[in-house]
C-alpha cells in the first residue's frame, strides 16, 4: 500500500515500484563525480528565446534591460530589433525632400489563434504588427498620423519554435565572419616577399582594403576595384598633405610615399580616384565625392553594426561609441598605422582601452578564431529579412509620393506591406536556415534549436569550404562542441553550442570561468569571449582543490594563449574552467565514459541518440551522466507547475492545481499526437491527487522521458560473445522476450490527406458509392465514404472514397437530348479514392474533416477550389524485428540479424537469460571502450553495492568514492559525468562489493565476467564472458519503412523503364556492374531478358504478361525503347542512323505499332490497371484540370 511521508517542502508519495524516490528533485542519481559546479547550466533554449525577445522588444527583454542598466554591465542591447529597423528607415523622403514619412513605436496585438489551434488547422502562429506612421508635407507644414497594419508577424512559441502553416519549424543560428578590421600576411608570388594587407569589412556596404605591396608602397582598394595609392585616398577623404604628415610623423614608410605623391589638392585626388573606380564615366570632383560618400559615409548604405564598431575599437585601440556605426577618418588612419607596424615587425601598438593608454599586441588575424566569427541568431536573421522588405517598400513609398496628389496623401495610401510580408514568408518557408523541426525525441528537438550552421545565405557553401574552416579550433573550447557534427559533406560546417555557452549582444559566444585570486579559486564566475581567452592563464576544471578552494599542487595544467597546455605555477593562474563538461554539447554530455571513447565513435554516438525512437514504455538509463534531467526539463516536452500549490485533479489529459495564492491552474496534456518524424507524441501525468508541487517541478512526462529524466532507450542485459556467426560484422542477436513484452516496441502515426476540388468538369465528390468496387472494399467506410475510427487497414484499403468527373468527348444531339430528359445520372466518374500506400498497415485513430460550410462558420481557411478536406491518422504498433537498427551510446550500432527464443539464449548461473549478444570484435578496433565500462557499471547499478563488504578498510579505491555513494539498493540509477567519471579501479572495487542475489551468490566476478550456460544444451561456456546492463536505443531506421517489392508499377515516360525507389513503387536497378556479372557467367538469355522484357521492351512485356496469364510459351523479345531513344538522340545530332536486319535490309522503326494499349486490347486485358497497393490515381492523361 502507498504510504505518505511529509518533509518540510515536499509530500512524497512512495509506491512499491518507485523505491521511495522524490520525483521532483533535480536528479536522484547517485553521482560519482568529484567536481562541484559553481553555476548551473544556462537555459538550454535561451539561444533561441532571448534573441526573439530582443527582436520584438517584449516584457522579458525589457526586464533584462532594466537589470542590465542597474548593474551597469552592458550585456544586453538596449534598443529592440524592430525599433532599430524602423529607426533606420525613417524618414523616407521624396526626391525633392519636401515630404517625409516616419515610423515609430511598433507594437503587437494579441495572436489570432493559440499554438494548439495553429497546429490543428494548419495556420501560422502569428500576431498582427502595427506601427505609428507620420506623414509630413514640408510645403504646407501639415502632419498626418495613422496607425498602420504591417502584416501578420510570426511569433515564437514558448519553446523557441515557429508554427508555419501548421508545421513546427526552427530557425538555426548562423556562424558568419564578424564585421571589423582584419590583417593578413601573404607571400608575393614573384618576389617571395611578404605582403601585408588590411580589410575593413562592414555589416552592410563596400569593403575597404589596404595593402603594403612588395615595393613598400601603401595601396588602397575601394570596393574590390583597382589598387591605387593610399595617400590619394587620404587626400580624397579631406586630409591635406600637412595633416597626413602630422598624423604619420612616426611612420617613415607613409612619409616616403607622401613625398613621392604629385597630386596636391582634394579635388585632384577625388578626380584621380573616380577615374580608377569608374573609368567609363567623366571624372569630376563632385562625382568622386558623391561616390565616396555613398560607399563609406552614408549611414543608409554603409553600416558597421555595433559589433563592427566593437571589433574596430578592440583591434585598433580607438574609443568611439558602440552605437556609432559609421566609418571615420580616425579609423582609417589607425588601420594604416597598425598595418605599417605589422609590416615593420613591431610587437606592440599604442592604443586606448577604457580611457587608459595601453600597448596592443600586433599580429595577423585568424579568420577561423571564434573571436572573429559570430552568431547570427534568429532575431537578427528575421531583422535582416524585415530590413530587406522595408527597403523594397521604401521604393514604392517614394514612387507614390511623386505620383499621388499631395493634399490627399495619408500614411496608409503610401504604404504597401506586400513586399515586407513576402520577404518574411519566403524566409520562414524556403530559407536554408528555416528547418523542419526534428521532433524524433526531446534531445533531437533541443539539439536542433542549439545548432550552429556556417551554411546559408551570407555563409559558406559546402563545396568550397576548406579543411581549415571545418577543423576543430582551440577557441571552440566551451563555445562549440568538438564532437557533435554530422558525418558527410557538412562535417565541421554544422556544430552544436557547448553546454555552458551563451551568446552576448554582439553575437560572440561566451563561456564561463571561475576567477582565481593568488592561487585561491573563488566562486565568482565571469563569462568571456574567445579573444579575451588569449590574455589569461586558465586552469582546467579537474585541477585538485582542498576544501577551502586552494590548489593542492604547486603547479597547475593550464592553457596560455594559443599554445599547448603547459604546467604553470598556481600563483600565475587567473581563471579556471567551471566544469569538465564545459567543452562538449548537451548531446555529447549524455554519453557516460565519453573520455574512454575515440572521437569518431563519440560523434556517431551523439548523432544516434537524436535518432532514438520513443518507446511505448520509457525507461531512464541506469548509467547516466547527470545531464539527463536538464535535457528533459528544458526540452519543452514535460509539463511543469507554474506556481507552488496542491494537485486537485489528475486524469490522462488534464491536471488541475490549486495554487498557494488562491488561483487555479489547469494543464492540458498532449495525447497520441503525430510528431514531425511520425513518432507518437504523448504525455503522461506523474503526480497524484493531493500531492504538493513547487513552481518548476515536473508534473507530466513527455515522449522518451521517465520521471523527468531523459529516457531514450532501455537497460538490457548484454553479453559480449559471438554466437554461431550470427553477430558477425556488427550484427546483433536479441531475445524473443524483447518482442513478446513489447520492450522495444514503438508507436508511429502516419497522416494521409485528400481533398475534393472543383474541376472544370464539375465537382469531385466524397462518397461511398464508387464505380467497379465491391461491397467488401467499402465495408469499413461510413455513409459519408470515410473510414471508421478503429478500423484495421492494410496496403490498398480505401480510406476515403472519392469520385472525379471523367473527361468526355463532344456529345451528339441525341445524347444531349437524353441528358436533358434523364438529368446528370448517366455522367461518368472515375474512382480517385485515398488508399493506404503499399507497405503500410495500422489502425485508424483519428479523422479530421473540414468542409467549405464549416470553414466559413469557424473562420477557417480552405485553399481556393477545395470544397472539402479530410485527414486520416493511422497508428502502427511496431515491434522490434529482424533488420531494425539498434545502437548503444558509444557509436556501437548494429542491425538485428536473428531473434532467438528466450530458452535458446545463454543464461547466467541463476537462470536469467541475456537479452542481447554483441560481438566482442566490435570493441578493440573501434576503440570505444566506454561501452565496456558502461556494461560493468550497469551491472553494479542493477545489483546494488555496499563498499563495507570489502574487508580491506584501507583500500585505495574507497578514497575515490564520493560521500553518499558508499552503498545503494538494487536498480539505483547512477551518474558518471563526462571527464569526471568513475575510475577503472573504482569499478573493479565496486564489482567485488555488489550485493549478492537471493541465493547469496555474486553472479559477476571482480573482472566483470560471469560463467554463462548455453541455452540449447545447458552446458557452461568454456571461458567467462563479460555480462552487464547497457542502455540500448532503437533507431529510426526501421526495416518496415525500407522493405519494398514491386509488382506491376509505373514506367518512366521517355525510356519506358520502371521507376526507382519505394515512393514511386519502383523496381531494383539492374545496373552496369550487375550486367558484367551476368556476362561473366555467360548467362546470355537471362541477360537478354533483363534488358528487354523485364525493362523497356514495351510490346514484349505486354505479350509476356499475356502468355503468362494464358499459360502459353513466352514470345521472343522486341526492340527496347531505350534503343529507339538512342537513335532519336543521334538523329538530333544530324546523324542519319539506320537499323539493318540479318539480311542487311533496313528495318522501319516507326512507332505506330508500339502503342502498348492497342496490343493489350488485342490480348483482351488491361495492362494499365495496377493492383490496389500501387493504384494511387489513374493515368495522368485523364487527370482533370483544376480551376
Swiss-Prot record:
Region Disordered: start-end pairs: 1150-1187
Residues annotated as transmembrane: none
Catalyses which reaction(s): RNA(n) + a ribonucleoside 5'-triphosphate = RNA(n+1) + diphosphate
InterPro entries: DNA-dir_RNA_pol_bsu_ext_1_sf, DNA-dir_RNA_pol_bsu_external_1, DNA-dir_RNA_pol_su2, DNA-dir_RNAP_su2_dom, DNA-dir_RNAP_su2_hyb_sf, RNA_pol_bsu_bac, RNA_pol_bsu_CS, RNA_pol_bsu_protrusion
Keyword field: DNA-directed RNA polymerase, Nucleotidyltransferase, Transcription, Transferase
Swiss-Prot/TrEMBL GO biological process terms: DNA-templated transcription
Paired cysteines (S-S): none
Signal peptide range: none
Known EC number: 2.7.7.6
CDD domains: RNA_pol_B_RPB2 (cd00653)
Single annotated GO MF: DNA-directed RNA polymerase activity
Cellular component, GO, one term: DNA-directed RNA polymerase complex
Stored Pfam families: RNA_pol_Rpb2_1 (PF04563), RNA_pol_Rpb2_2 (PF04561), RNA_pol_Rpb2_3 (PF04565), RNA_pol_Rpb2_45 (PF10385), RNA_pol_Rpb2_6 (PF00562), RNA_pol_Rpb2_7 (PF04560)
Biased composition (Basic and acidic residues): 1173-1187
The protein's role, per its UniProt record: DNA-dependent RNA polymerase catalyzes the transcription of DNA into RNA using the four ribonucleoside triphosphates as substrates.
SUBUNIT field: The RNAP catalytic core consists of 2 alpha, 1 beta, 1 beta' and 1 omega subunit. When a sigma factor is associated with the core the holoenzyme is formed, which can initiate transcription.
Family statement drawn from the similarity comment of this UniProt entry: Belongs to the RNA polymerase beta chain family.
Protein name (Swiss-Prot/TrEMBL): DNA-directed RNA polymerase subunit beta
Organism: Bifidobacterium longum (strain NCC 2705)
Amino acid at each position: 500500500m502507498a504510504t505518505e511521508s511529509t518533509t518540510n517542502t515536499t509530500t512524497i508519495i512512495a509506491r512499491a515500484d518507485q523505491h521511495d524516490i522524490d520525483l521532483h528533485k533535480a536528479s536522484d542519481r547517485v553521482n560519482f563525480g568529484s567536481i562541484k559546479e559553481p553555476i548551473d547550466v544556462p537555459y538550454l533554449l535561451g539561444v533561441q528565446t532571448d534573441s526573439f525577445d530582443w527582436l520584438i522588444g517584449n516584457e522579458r527583454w525589457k526586464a533584462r534591460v532594466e537589470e542590465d542598466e542597474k548593474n551597469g554591465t552592458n550585456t544586453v542591447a538596449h534598443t529592440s530589433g524592430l525599433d532599430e529597423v524602423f529607426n533606420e528607415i525613417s524618414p523616407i523622403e521624396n526626391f525633392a525632400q519636401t515630404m517625409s514619412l516616419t515610423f515609430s513605436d511598433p507594437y503587437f496585438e494579441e495572436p489570432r489563434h493559440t499554438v494548439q489551434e495553429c497546429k490543428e488547422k494548419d495556420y501560422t502562429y502569428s500576431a498582427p504588427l502595427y506601427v505609428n506612421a507620420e506623414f509630413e508635407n514640408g510645403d504646407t507644414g501639415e502632419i498626418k498620423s495613422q496607425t498602420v497594419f504591417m502584416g501578420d508577424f510570426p511569433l515564437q512559441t514558448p519553446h523557441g519554435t515557429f508554427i508555419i502553416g501548421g508545421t513546427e519549424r526552427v530557425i538555426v543560428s548562423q556562424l558568419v565572419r564578424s564585421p571589423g578590421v582584419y590583417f593578413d600576411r601573404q607571400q608575393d608570388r614573384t618576389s617571395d616577399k611578404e605582403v601585408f594587407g588590411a580589410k575593413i569589412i562592414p555589416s552592410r556596404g563596400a569593403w575597404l582594403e589596404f595593402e603594403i605591396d612588395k615595393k613598400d608602397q601603401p595601396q588602397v582598394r575601394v570596393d574590390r576595384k583597382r589598387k591605387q595609392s593610399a595617400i590619394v585616398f587620404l587626400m580624397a577623404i579631406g586630409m591635406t598633405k600637412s595633416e597626413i604628415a602630422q598624423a604619420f610623423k612616426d611612420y617613415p614608410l607613409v612619409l616616403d610615399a607622401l613625398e613621392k605623391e604629385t597630386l596636391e589638392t582634394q579635388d585632384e585626388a577625388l578626380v584621380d580616384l573616380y577615374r580608377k573606380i569608374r573609368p567609363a564615366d567623366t571624372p569630376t570632383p563632385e562625382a568622386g565625392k558623391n561616390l565616396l560618400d555613398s560607399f563609406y559615409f552614408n549611414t543608409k548604405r554603409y553600416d558597421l553594426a555595433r559589433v563592427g564598431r566593437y571589433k574596430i575599437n578592440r583591434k585598433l585601440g580607438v574609443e568611439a561609441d558602440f552605437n556609432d556605426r559609421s566609418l571615420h577618418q580616425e579609423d582609417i588612419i589607425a588601420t594604416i598605422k597598425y598595418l605599417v607596424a605589422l609590416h615593420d615587425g613591431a610587437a606592440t601598438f599604442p592604443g586606448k582601452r577604457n580611457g587608459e593608454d595601453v600597448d596592443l599586441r600586433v599580429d595577423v588575424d585568424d579568420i577561423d578564431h571564434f573571436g572573429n566569427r559570430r552568431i547570427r541568431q534568429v532575431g537578427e536573421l528575421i531583422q535582416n529579412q524585415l530590413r530587406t522588405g522595408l527597403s523594397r517598400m521604401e521604393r514604392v513609398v517614394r514612387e507614390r509620393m511623386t505620383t499621388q496628389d499631395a493634399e490627399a496623401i495619408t500614411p496608409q495610401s503610401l504604404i504597401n506591406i506586400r513586399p515586407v510580408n513576402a520577404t518574411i514568408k519566403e524566409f520562414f518557408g524556403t530559407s536554408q536556415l528555416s528547418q523542419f523541426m526534428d521532433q524524433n525525441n526531446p534531445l533531437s528537438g533541443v539539439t536542433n534549436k542549439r545548432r550552429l550552421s556556417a551554411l546559408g545565405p551570407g555563409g559558406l557553401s559546402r563545396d568550397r569550404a576548406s579543411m581549415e574552416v571545418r577543423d576543430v579550433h582551440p577557441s571552440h573550447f566551451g563555445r562549440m562542441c568538438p564532437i557533435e557534427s554530422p558525418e558527410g559533406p557538412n562535417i565541421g560546417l554544422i556544430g552544436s553550442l557547448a553546454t555552458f555557452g551563451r551568446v552576448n549582444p554582439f553575437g560572440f559566444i561566451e563561456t564561463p570561468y571561475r576567477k582565481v585570486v593568488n592561487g585561491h579559486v573563488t566562486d565568482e564566475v565571469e563569462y568571456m569571449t574567445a579573444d579575451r581567452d588569449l590574455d589569461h592563464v586558465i586552469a582546467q576544471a579537474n585541477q585538485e582543490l582542498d576544501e577551502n578552494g586552494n590548489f593542492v599542487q604547486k603547479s597547475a595544467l593550464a592553457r596560455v594563449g594559443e599554445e599547448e597546455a603547459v604546467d604553470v605555477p598556481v600563483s600565475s593562474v587567473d581563471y579556471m574552467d567551471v566544469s569538465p563538461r564545459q567543452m562538449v554539447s548537451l548531446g555529447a554530455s549524455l554519453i557516460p565514459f565519453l573520455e574512454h571513447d575515440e572521437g569518431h565513435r563519440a560523434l556517431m554516438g551523439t548523432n544516434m541518440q537524436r535518432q532514438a525512437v520513443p518507446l511505448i514504455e520509457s525507461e531512464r538509463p541506469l548509467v547516466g551522466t547527470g545531464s539527463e534531467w536538464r535535457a528533459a526539463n528544458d526540452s519543452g516536452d514535460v509539463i511543469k507547475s507554474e506556481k507552488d500549490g496542491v494537485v486537485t485533479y489528475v486524469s490522462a489529459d488534464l491536471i488541475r492545481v490549486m495554487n498557494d495564492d488562491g488561483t487555479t491552474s489547469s494543464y492540458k496534456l498532449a495525447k497520441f499526437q503525430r510528431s514531425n518524424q511520425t513518432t507518437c507524441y504523448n504525455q503522461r501525468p506523474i503526480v497524484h491527487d493531493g500531492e504538493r508541487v513547487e513552481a518548476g517541478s515536473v508534473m507530466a512526462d513527455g515522449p522518451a522521458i521517465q520521471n523527468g529524466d531523459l529516457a531514450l532507450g532501455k537497460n538490457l542485459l548484454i553479453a559480449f560473445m559471438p554466437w554461431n556467426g550470427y553477430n558477425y560484422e556488427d550484427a546483433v542477436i536479441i531475445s524473443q522476450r524483447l518482442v513478446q513484452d513489447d520492450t522495444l516496441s514503438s508507436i508511429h502515426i502516419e497522416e494521409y490527406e485528400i481533398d475534393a476540388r472543383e474541376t472544370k468538369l464539375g465537382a469531385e465528390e466524397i462518397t461511398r458509392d464508387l464505380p467497379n468496387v465491391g461491397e467488401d472494399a467499402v465495408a469499413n467506410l461510413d455513409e459519408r465514404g470515410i473510414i471508421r475510427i478503429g478500423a484495421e487497414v492494410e496496403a490498398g484499403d480505401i480510406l476515403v472514397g472519392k469520385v472525379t468527373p471523367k473527361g468526355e468527348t463532344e456529345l451528339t444531339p441525341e445524347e444531349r437530348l437524353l441528358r436533358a430528359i434523364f438529368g446528370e445520372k448517366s455522367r461518368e466518374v472515375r474512382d480517385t479514392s485515398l488508399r493506404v500506400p503499399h507497405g503500410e498497415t495500422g489502425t485508424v485513430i483519428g479523422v479530421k474533416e473540414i468542409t467549405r460550410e464549416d470553414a466559413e462558420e469557424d473562420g477557417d481557411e480552405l485553399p481556393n477550389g477545395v470544397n472539402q478536406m479530410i485527414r486520416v491518422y493511422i497508428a502502427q504498433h511496431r515491434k522490434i524485428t529482424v533488420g531494425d537498427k539498434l545502437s548503444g551510446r558509444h557509436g556501437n550500432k548494429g542491425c538485428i540479424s536473428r531473434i532467438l527464443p528466450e530458452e535458446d539464449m545463454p543464461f547466467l548461473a541463476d537462470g536469467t537469460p541475456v537479452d542481447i549478444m554483441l560481438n566482442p570484435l566490435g570493441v578493440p578496433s573501434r576503440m570505444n571502450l566506454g561501452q565496456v565500462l558502461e556494461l560493468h557499471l550497469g551491472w553494479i547499478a542493477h545489483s546494488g553495492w555496499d563498499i563495507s563488504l570489502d574487508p580491506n578498510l584501507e583500500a585505495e579505491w574507497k578514497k575515490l568514492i564520493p560521500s553518499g555513494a558508499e552503498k545503494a539498493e538494487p536498480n539505483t540509477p547512477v551518474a558518471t559525468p563526462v571527464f569526471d567519471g568513475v575510475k577503472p579501479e573504482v569499478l573493479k572495487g565496486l564489482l567485488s562489493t555488489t550485493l549478492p542475489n537471493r541465493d547469496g551468490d555474486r553472479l559477476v566476478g571482480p573482472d566483470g565476467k560471469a560463467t554463462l550456460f548455453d541455452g540449447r544444451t545447458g552446458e557452461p561456456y568454456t571461458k567467462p564472458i563479460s555480462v552487464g546492463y547497457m542502455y540500448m536505443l532503437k533507431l529510426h531506421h526501421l526495416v518496415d519503412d525500407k522493405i519494398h517489392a514491386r509488382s506491376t508499377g509505373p514506367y518512366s515516360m521517355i525510356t519506358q523503364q520502371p521507376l526507382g525507389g519505394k515512393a514511386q513503387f519502383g523496381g531494383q536497378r539492374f545496373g552496369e556492374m550487375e550486367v558484367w556479372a551476368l556476362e561473366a557467367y555467360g548467362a546470355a538469355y537471362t541477360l537478354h531478358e533483363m534488358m528487354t522484357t523485364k525493362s523497356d521492351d514495351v510490346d514484349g512485356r505486354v505479350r509476356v504478361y499475356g502468355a503468362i496469364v494464358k499459360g502459353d510459351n513466352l514470345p521472343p523479345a522486341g526492340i527496347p525503347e531505350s534503343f529507339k531513344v538512342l537513335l532519336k538522340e543521334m538523329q538530333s545530332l544530324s546523324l542519319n542512323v539506320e537499323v539493318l536486319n540479318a539480311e542487311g535490309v533496313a528495318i522501319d522503326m516507326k512507332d505506330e505499332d508500339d502503342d502498348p494499349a492497342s496490343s493489350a486490347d488485342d490480348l483482351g486485358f488491361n495492362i494499365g490497371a495496377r493492383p490496389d497497393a500501387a493504384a494511387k490515381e489513374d493515368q495522368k492523361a485523364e487527370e482533370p484540370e483544376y480551376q
